[in-house]
Amino acid sequence: MKTYDYIVVGSGIAGLTAARVLSQHGKSVLLLEKATILGGSLARFRVEGIPYDVGFHFTGGFTDNADGVLDQMLGILGVRDRIRPLFFPREASHRIIFPSLNTSYTVPSGIEVIREKLKQDFPRERKGIDRYHERYRNVVEATPSLNLLGLDEFPKPISEDVITLKDVIDECVSDPMLKCLLGALCMCYGTRPNEVSFKNHCLVSYSLQETLARVEDGGDGFVDALVAVLQQGNVDIRTRTSIEQCADVRDRKVHRFVLTDGSEVSAKACIFTIHPQSILATLPKENLSKGFQNRVNDFEPSDAFFTVYGAIDSPADGGAMTLVSILPDTDLDDMLTCHAPDPVDGPMMVLRSREKDSDGHPVHTVTALEVAFVDTCKQWENTKLKRRPPEYYNYKQQRGDSIVRRMHEHIPECRDMRVIDTASSLTYRDYLHNPHGSAYGIRQKIGQFNVVGRLPLNNIYAAGQSALLPGVIGAMMSSLFVCRNLLGREVFDEYLNSKSCLSTAR
């Protein structure tokens, strides 16, 4: 039986980050991935040779002078120079269309720039806009982990932990469209404004408002960069393999791990970066309290997406990289609530990008993500990929047609798009091996205690987008927090402050 220092389960950005940090400290690591390819939701797929992203579409945290929090984390991992961010135009990062109001709004980058633009465009709400942004800024300043060197301290509780985003917005402003603009980025973590704490909204949206960027080669850019450096270290990587059983539990520690390929290994500790309910299914129930099991089972999935993937052969505008949202109403809570088994005409994001196909030829891609709900496909939840009944494929066709119709109506530059493929929440569930097919793991509800750090078994840890905060930055931070715990604060602080690490982050 082979022995490792650490096992990391899941090869998304959280798993890759944890494996890299531990290997940088000379630890032997076994990285396990249940799928056939590495990357989790970062991994791309290709249809007709055209690349599309599954779960990574854009991010914040990059800056022109490479001092953003994502720049710094990638610098510490030694891969920042391997990844090329592609910035959306600062003056027009995101266009939001309101069909019911017969208007649209262009959102720039930069929190202070956004603040001044909103005050100019909503003059009667100037004082409320200032109050909102001052409160927003106070949350950011009270959270040291948004700065790389603050990662040696877990975020402390503040009053905004127990106040919803909706409460703060309602307190500050009254214009319905302005309320929607202030809360619109909740679609980037799949939780309604009346459910999420104001603090968590600030932490997720902060970097997205400062700068907005894609990455050359999309999610594969992160995966390829990190896998390349992992292969140079003391890391064994196995695909199509996960943990089947945590065995030989003594003194609240797992001493033997039985893998799905039939082999057995041992390790000092294991870090799970997969969905909390998948972690719970792997751990021995007799060693877990009913309270812990109930807490994990009570987690609700975040909203999902129904996605249309398309291509434009000869775009009229030359194929600019754009992000456009279509919001049918101004009430985000209502739009992000499932009212029927088959919701249509919901909130939607449409991303256009320039890519290269398998032969290296330029292609112009379109990804349209309409908010969906995991219950929408509940009637087919016990069916398998490519073995579903005709009714399911009729549903996919009708919903895809509806999305294309809306794009043609509201986004003229997409009228020449041809549909390449579509995906429902079941597609995401089966492709990503998560329980529900939700877009962002668990719903980030106020007052909820996520599963992060050490679990009831003393050498089992949890990280990932459901642990701390969703998104690339939140998932990476969760792994850094766990690694600090495993390596010790003094060692980890020296690591963060070392010249060799930070020189590549500057």
Each language-model region and where it sits:
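Active-site-proximal substrate-binding core of FAD-dependent oxidoreductases
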Residues: G488-R506
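Mid-domain catalytic core of redox enzymes
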Residues: R214, E244-H361, S503
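A conserved FAD-binding loop/helix module that cradles the flavin
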Residues: Q465-L487
